[in-house]
C-alpha cells in the first residue's frame, strides 16, 4: 500500500530525559523516525524535553519543541499546531504513556488527531497486565500463573494459593520500576507497596516465578498488509529473573534447537498480528531448558532498548522502517537501506556473534545494592561483534571502560567457594566474572549450572577462555598460541601481563609476524548480496572487507557506554563533529561501541568501526586507514585518556596538543600556567601520601575539597570538614601514590559559573555563560544551570570573559574548552578547565544557535574562527531565560544516598525556557519529574549549620500558605522566629513519626540537608530514601529549595488581611 496522502503533519513524541531504563536508544530511534518521515514528504513536529539529543536539533524536524512531556504542555502544542496524527511508539514508555493520557483526556478527539503505528487498543492490550493476560488466553499462548492485584490483601490471597517465590510486575512502568521477586512476606509487602505506587493505574501483576528458564527475545516487524518478519532473535546469558536490560545478551540465540527457534518465532508473529501492531515490537519469552514448555513474559508494543540493539546487531534500521510502516508503506515496498538491492521483507541473517553487556553505575555508588533482579539498574550498555562467542564476549568486556581487559577481576581471586556460590545464586553485576573465577578454581560446570541455571553452552565458552589462559601462560613467546588466543578475543594487555612484557612489545611482535586482524562488514544478509554499508568489526580471519580509499580521512573517537558523568551529550558532540569533517571534504571515520546511540548509526559517518575504545583496538583501525589524525575532544574522558598512548604510537592528535591537554589536567603545570596569566584560583596543593594530605589540609584550613587528578563526573570527590573525615577518604576512596596524586583545595562557598568557549589559538569565542543555582560544591552536572546569568554584575561578567580569553590563548587551546569559576567575595576564581567538549555543549548550541561542536571541528581542521564568521568575544545574550535541570534515577537504585555533592549522580537533563526565570524554572522542574503543588505541607529537618538560612525559607513557605512540619530541634528555632510549626516525632520514635507522614503522602516537600560527620547521617539517609520511594520531592540543597520557592511564589496570589496591610503602610506616611 502506498504511503498515506490524507495526513500531512505528524507530531512525534520523544522520550524525555535519560533515566535508568530509558537511555540514548530513543534518541537514536526518534532521530531515525523524524528523518524517515521527512524523506516521505511529511511535515514533522517534535516534542521532547531533553536538550542533550540529536533528536532535538532544529534540523531533525520541521518544528522542534523542547518542552515538558506532560499533558498540560503537549496538549497546548497539539492545540496550537493541529497535527493530523501523532506517532508515540518511538518515544519509549514515556511516549506510550503520553499517548494514553492524551487519548483519555479527550484532546486527540477534540483536535481530530489520529494515533499512528500502534493503535491505542493495542498499547492498552500490551501494557495493561489484565488485558494482556486475557488476549494470551484467547490465543492459547501460555503465561505463568498470575493474578492482577490492586492492594496488599489481594497479593496475600494469591501467594496463599500459589506459594513463593512470586514476581511483581507493575503496569505501565519503565524498566521494571517498582517490581521485583519476592521470596517471603517481608519482601512481598515492600515490593507490592512500591509497585502499586509506581504504576500510574495502581495495578500490579503477581505471577509465579519462572526464574531459571531461558530468556529469549524476538524483535518483530509488521505492516498494514499483515506482512510480519523477525528482524533478530536474542538470548540472555542470564536466565529469567534478571531484567533483560541488566542481562548479558547474545544475538543470534546460541542454544535453541531449530524446533525451539521456530516454535518461539511463530508465537512472536502470532502475538504481533493479534495486537494489530504496525511497526516494531519486542516479544519476551521464557523457555524451560528441559522441555518444550514456554511462557510469554511480556510484549513491548513499541521500539525499545532491544530494538536499538537488534538494529545495530543486524544493520536493519528498525526505527526508520517502523516510521515508514506507520504512514502506510509495506515491507515489500521499502528498499533495505543496507543492501540497497533487497526489500525490507527479507529477514536479516548473521554470520557473526553479537554480545551486549550492561554498564552499571556501581563504580559511582559504592553503597548501592548490586543485586540484579526484575528492576533495571544499568545506565547504558556496550556491544561487540566477533566470529565466535569467546571473541565477542572478551571484546565487550574491554569495551566497558572499567579498566578491565579480560574476564577476570583481581579482587575476586580471594573469594572462597561458599562466597562465590552465594554471589552466583544471587546474581550481581560481577556474576560472569565470578563464574570464570570459579572455573579457574576448579568448580565444575555442573555445580555452577545447579547454582544459577546458566546454560552449559555458555559455561563451556567461559571454560574455553580459562583453558586458553593456561595455554598462554604455559607457552611464553609461542606464536601459534598467540594466534589462537587472538582468535578467541584475548587482548594484548592480558598477554603482555602473562608473558611479562609491555603491551607495545606484544603489538610489535604481532606486526613482525603479520598477525593483525581483518575487518568484516555488517550487511544484514550474511554476504548473500553485495552490500553498500561501510559498517565493520574486527576479527582474526583471512579476508579484509574494509577497502581503504585514497581520500584524506579523520578518525573521531566516540565516548563508549552511557554512564553517570558521561552521557548522551558526548554522543551529540561526536555526531556533529563527524558531520563537520564531512562538510570539510574529509572522509569521516568513527570508532565507538555503544549500540544505543546516533553515532553508531552507519548512515552518519563514511565508515563506522564497532570496536572497543582501547589503544590496541583503535591502533588496528589506524594502521589500516592511516588517517590525517585523530580527534579526541568529543568522546569525553574515554577519548582524552587514549591521547598519550596514541601519540606514543606516532599518531597525530588533532586540535589541542597532548602537551597542552596535560597542562590543563596536571595540577602543578596548571597552577603555574594560572600564576603566569595572573588568574586567581582557590589555594590548593597536591598530595602523594596520606601524611602530606593531612599537612596540606591543616595549612590551608578546613573545609577542603579533595579529589584524584584526571577524573570525569567528579568520581571520588568530596568536601571534607575535619581531619578524621580526610583520613577516612584517603583510606577508602582513593589509592594515593606518586602516579595518582590527590588534589586538595580550599573549599569556597560561592556562586558557581560555567563557561563553554571555542579557541583557535588566536581568537577565543564564548557562546554562553551559565550560572548555577546551587553554590559551588554541588557537581556542575547535578546543578540547575541558568542562561543567561541572572545575578552576575557586569563587572564580574567582564572578569569572566577576560579570564576565559586569556585561558584559551594561554593554554594554546585549539577546539573546545569548558571552564568552571566560583565567585567568592566579589572575586572570580578558576576551579577547573576542561580542554574538551563538556556536557553543556548541546544545551548552549541549541539556545544560542552556535553549532559549537561543528565550529570547533572546523577550527581543529584548520579553519580559524574569523573565517567562520566568529571572532574573539562574547556572543550576544538571548532575551528568553533557559534552565537546564538535572534528572536522577534514584527510584531504581535502592540504598543510594540522594544528597547532592561534588560526586555526580544525575543520569540525564531537561530544559525549560520562557520569558522569566520563574516560568523557565517551573518548566524545567516539571519536566524533570518534580511535582509542584501550590499548597500542602513541608517537612523541614536541617543540619545545625543550615538552621539560620532555613528560617528565611520556612517563613516564605508559611507566607504562601504551606503547613510547616519539623522535628523538635528545628521546630524550636522556628517558634523562636514566630513561625507557626507542627512538631513531628523523630524517626526512632515508636509513635506516629516523620516517616509515617512521608509514607502516607501527607507531605509535598521534604527539606533535608546533610549532617556533617557522616554518622547521624543515617537518619537523614532514611528520610531521603523514604521520600524517593514514595515519590515525594526531597530537597537536599537550600539553593534548589529557594528556586522552587521562587516558582511557587510566582504562582501564588498573596492573601493578607486589610489590618496587616494598613499596619505596614502606617510607617511609610511621608509628612509634607
From Swiss-Prot:
Keywords: Amino-acid biosynthesis, Arginine biosynthesis, ATP-binding, Ligase, Magnesium, Manganese, Metal-binding, Nucleotide-binding, Pyrimidine biosynthesis, Repeat. Mg(2+) 3 binds at residues 820, 832. One of its GO terms (cellular component) is cytoplasm. Residues 133-327, 671-861 form the ATP-grasp domain. ATP 1 binds at residues 129, 169, 175-176, 208, 210, 215, 241-243, 284, 298. It is an enzyme of class 6 (ligase). One of its GO terms (molecular function) is metal ion binding. Mn(2+) 4 binds at residues 832, 834. Pfam families: CPSase_L_D2, CPSase_L_D3, MGS. Its cofactor is Mg(2+); Mn(2+). Mg(2+) 4 binds at residues 832, 834. Residues 930-1072 are annotated as: Allosteric domain. GO terms for biological process: 'de novo' UMP biosynthetic process; glutamine metabolic process; L-arginine biosynthetic process. Mn(2+) 2 binds at residues 298, 300. Mn(2+) 3 binds at residues 820, 832. InterPro entries: ATP-grasp (IPR011761), ATP_grasp_subdomain_1 (IPR013815), CarbamoylP_synth_lsu (IPR006275), CarbamoylP_synth_lsu_oligo (IPR005480), CarbamoylP_synth_lsu_oligo_sf (IPR036897), CbamoylP_synth_lsu-like_ATP-bd (IPR005479), CbamoylP_synth_lsu_CPSase_dom (IPR005483), MGS-like_dom (IPR011607). Binds 4 Mg(2+) or Mn(2+) ions per subunit. Its EC number is 6.3.4.16, 6.3.5.5. Mg(2+) 2 binds at residues 298, 300. ATP 2 binds at residues 707, 746, 752, 777-780, 820, 832. The keyword Metal-binding applies. Residues 1-401 are annotated as: Carboxyphosphate synthetic domain. PROSITE patterns: ATP_GRASP, CPSASE_1, CPSASE_2, MGS. Belongs to the CarB family. The large subunit is composed of 2 ATP-grasp domains that are involved in binding the 2 ATP molecules needed for carbamoyl phosphate synthesis. The N-terminal ATP-grasp domain (referred to as the carboxyphosphate synthetic component) catalyzes the ATP-dependent phosphorylation of hydrogencarbonate to carboxyphosphate and the subsequent nucleophilic attack by ammonia to form a carbamate intermediate. This is Carbamoyl phosphate synthase large chain.
Amino acid at each position: 500500500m502506498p504511503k498515506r496522502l490524507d495526513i500531512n503533519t505528524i507530531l512525534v513524541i520523544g522520550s524525555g530525559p535519560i533515566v535508568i531504563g530509558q537511555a540514548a536508544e530513543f534518541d537514536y530511534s526518534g532521530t531515525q523516525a523524524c528523518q524517515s518521515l521527512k524523506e516521505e514528504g511529511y511535515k514533522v513536529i517534535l516534542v521532547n524535553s531533553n536538550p542533550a539529543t540529536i533528536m532535538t536539533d532544529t534540523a531533525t524536524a520541521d518544528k522542534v519543541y523542547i518542552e515538558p512531556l506532560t499533558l498540560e504542555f503537549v496538549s497546548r502544542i497539539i492545540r496550537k499546531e493541529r497535527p493530523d496524527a501523532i506517532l508515540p511508539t518511538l518515544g519509549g514508555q514515556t511516549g506510550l504513556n503520553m499517548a494514553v493520557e492524551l487519548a483519555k483526556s479527550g484532546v486527540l478527539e477534540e483536535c481530530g488527531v489520529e494515533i499512528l503505528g500502534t493503535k491505542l487498543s493495542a498499547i492498552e492490550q500490551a501494557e495493561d497486565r489484565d488485558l494482556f493476560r486475557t488476549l494470551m488466553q484467547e490465543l492459547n499462548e501460555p503465561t505463568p500463573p498470575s493474578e492482577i492485584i490492586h492492594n496488599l490483601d489481594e497479593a496475600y490471597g494469591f501467594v496463599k494459593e500459589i506459594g513463593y517465590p512470586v514476581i511483581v510486575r507493575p503496569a505501565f512502568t519503565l524498566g521494571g520500576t517498582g517490581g521485583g521477586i519476592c521470596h517471603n512476606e517481608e519482601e512481598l509487602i515492600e515490593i507490592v507497596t512500591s509497585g502499586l505506587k509506581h504504576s500510574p493505574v495502581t495495578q500490579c501483576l503477581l505471577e509465579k516465578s519462572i526464574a531459571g528458564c531461558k530468556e529469549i527475545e524476538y524483535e518483530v516487524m509488521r505492516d498494514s498488509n499483515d506482512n510480519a518478519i523477525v528482524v533478530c532473535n536474542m538470548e540472555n546469558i542470564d536466565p529469567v529473573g534478571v531484567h533483560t536490560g541488566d542481562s548479558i545478551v547474545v544475538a543470534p540465540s546460541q542454544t535453541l534447537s531449530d524446533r525451539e527457534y521456530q516454535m518461539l518465532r511463530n508465537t512472536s508473529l502470532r502475538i504481533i498480528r493479534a495486537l494489530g501492531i504496525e511497526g516494531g515490537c519486542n516479544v519476551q519469552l521464557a523457555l524451560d531448558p528441559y522441555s518444550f514448555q514456554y511462557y510469554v513474559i511480556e510484549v513491548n508494543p513499541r521500539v525499545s532498548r532491544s530494538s536499538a540493539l537488534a538494529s545495530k546487531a543486524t544493520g536493519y534500521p528498525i526505527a526508520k522502517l517502523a516510521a515508514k510502516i506507520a504512514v502506510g508503506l509495506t515491507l515489500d515496498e521499502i528498499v533495505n537501506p543496507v543492501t540497497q538491492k533487497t526489500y525490507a521483507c527479507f529477514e536479516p541473517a548473521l554470520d557473526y556473534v553479537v554480545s551486549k553487556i550492561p554498564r552499571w553505575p556501581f563504580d559511582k555508588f559504592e553503597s548501592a545494592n548490586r543485586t540484579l533482579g526484575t528492576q533495571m539498574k544499568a545506565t547504558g550498555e556496550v556491544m561487540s561483534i566477533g566470529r565466535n562467542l569467546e571473541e565477542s564476549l572478551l571484546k565487550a568486556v574491554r569495551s566497558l571502560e572499567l579498566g578491565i581487559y579480560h574476564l577476570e577481576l583481581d579482587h575476586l581471586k580471594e573469594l572462597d567457594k561458599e562466597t562465590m556460590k552465594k554471589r552466583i545464586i544471587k546474581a550481581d553485576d560481577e556474576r560472569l566474572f565470578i563464574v570464570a573465577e570459579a572455573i579457574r578454581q576448579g568448580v565444575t560446570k555442573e555445580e555452577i549450572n545447579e547454582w544459577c541455571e546458566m546454560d552449559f553452552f555458555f559455561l563451556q565458552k567461559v571454560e574455553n577462555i580459562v583453558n586458553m589462559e593456561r595455554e598462554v601462560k604455559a607457552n611464553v613467546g609461542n606464536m601459534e598460541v598467540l594466534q589462537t588466543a587472538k582468535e578467541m578475543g584475548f587482548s594484548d594487555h592480558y598477554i603482555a601481563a602473562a608473558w611479562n612484557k609491555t603491551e607495545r612489545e606484544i603489538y610489535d611482535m604481532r606486526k613482525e609476524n603479520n598477525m593483525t586482524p581483518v575487518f568484516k562488514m555488517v550487511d544484514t544478509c550474511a554476504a548473500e548480496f553485495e552490500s553498500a554499508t561501510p559498517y565493520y568489526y574486527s576479527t582474526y580471519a583471512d579476508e579484509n572487507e574494509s577497502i581503504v580509499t585514497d581520500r584524506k580521512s579523520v578518525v573521531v573517537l566516540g565516548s563508549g557506554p552511557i554512564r553517570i558523568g558521561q552521557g548522551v551529550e558526548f554522543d551529540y558532540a561526536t555526531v556533529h563533529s563527524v558531520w563537520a569533517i564531512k562538510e570539510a571534504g574529509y572522509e569521516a571515520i568513527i570508532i565507538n561501541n555503544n549500540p544505543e546511540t546516533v553515532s553508531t548509526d552507519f548512515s552518519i559517518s563514511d565508515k563506522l568501526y564497532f570496536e572497543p575504545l582501547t589503544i590496541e583496538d583503535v591502533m588496528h583501525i589506524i594502521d589500516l586507514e592511516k588517517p590525517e589524525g585523530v580527534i579526541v575532544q568529543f568522546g569525553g574522558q574515554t577519548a582524552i585518556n587514549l591521547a598519550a598512548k596514541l601519540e606514543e604510537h606516532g599518531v597525530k592528535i588533532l586540535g589541542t596538543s597532548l602537551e597542552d591537554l596535560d597542562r590543563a589536567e596536571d595540577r602543578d603545570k596548571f597552577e603555574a600556567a594560572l600564576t603566569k596569566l595572573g588568574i586567581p584560583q582557590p589555594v590548593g596543593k597536591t598530595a602523594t601520601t596520606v601524611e602530606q594530605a593531612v599537612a596540606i589540609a591543616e595549612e590551608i584550613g578546613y573545609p577542603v575539597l579533595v579529589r584524584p587528578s584526571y577524573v570525569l563526573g567528579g568520581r571520588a570527590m568530596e568536601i571534607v570538614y575535619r581531619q578524621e573525615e580526610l583520613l577516612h577518604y584517603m583510606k577508602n576512596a582513593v589509592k594515593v601514590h606518586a602516579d595518582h596524586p590527590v588534589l586538595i583545595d580550599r573549599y569556597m562557598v560561592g556562586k558557581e559559573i560555567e563557561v563553554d568557549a571555542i579557541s583557535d589559538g588566536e581568537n577565543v569565542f564564548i557562546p554562553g555563560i551559565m550560572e548555577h543555582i546551587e553554590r559551588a560544591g554541588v557537581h556542575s552536572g547535578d546543578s540547575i544551570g541558568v542562561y543567561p546569568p541572572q545575578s552576575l554584575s557586569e563587572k564580574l561578567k567582564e572578569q569572566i570573559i577576560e579570564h576565559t580569553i586569556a585561558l584559551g590563548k594561554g593554554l594554546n587551546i585549539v577546539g573546545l574548552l569548558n571552564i568552571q569559576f566560583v565567585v567568592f567575595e566579589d572575586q572570580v576564581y578558576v576551579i577547573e578547565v576542561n580542554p574538551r567538549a563538556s556536557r553543556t555543549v548541546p544545551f548552549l548550541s541549541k539556545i544560542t544557535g552556535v553549532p559549537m561542536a561543528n565550529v570547533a571541528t572546523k577550527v581543529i581542521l584548520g579553519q580559524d574562527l574569523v573565517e567562520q564568521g566568529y571572532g574573539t568575544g562574547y556572543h550576544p545574550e538571548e532575551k528568553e531565560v533557559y534552565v537546564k535541570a538535572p534528572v536522577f534515577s534514584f527510584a531504581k537504585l535502592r540504598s543510594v544516598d540522594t544528597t547532592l555533592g561534588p560526586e555526580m549522580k544525575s543520569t540525564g537533563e531537561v530544559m525549560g525556557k520562557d520569558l522569566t526565570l520563574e516560568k523557565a524554572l517551573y518548566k524545567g522542574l516539571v519536566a524533570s519529574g518534580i511535582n509542584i503543588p501550590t499548597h500542602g505541607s513541608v517537612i523541614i529537618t536541617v543540619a545545625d549549620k543550615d538552621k539560620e538560612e532555613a528560617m528565611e525559607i520556612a517563613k516564605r513557605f508559611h507566607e504562601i500558605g504551606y503547613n510547616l512540619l519539623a522535628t523538635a530541634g528545628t521546630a524550636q528555632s522556628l517558634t523562636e522566629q514566630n513561625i507557626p510549626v507542627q512538631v513531628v516525632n523523630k524517626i526512632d520514635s515508636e509513635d506516629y513519626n516523620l516517616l509515617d507522614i512521608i509514607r502516607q503522602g501527607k507531605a509535598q516537600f521534604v527539606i533535608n540537608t546533610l549532617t556533617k560527620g557522616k554518622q547521624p547521617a543515617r537518619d537523614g539517609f532514611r528520610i531521603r530514601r523514604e521520600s524517593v520511594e514514595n515519590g515525594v520531592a526531597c530537597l537536599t540543597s537550600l539553593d534548589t529549595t529557594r528556586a522552587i520557592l521562587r516558582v511557587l511564589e510566582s504562582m501564588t496570589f498573596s492573601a493578607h488581611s486589610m489590618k496587616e496591610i494598613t499596619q505596614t503602610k502606617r510607617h511609610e506616611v511621608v509628612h509634607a
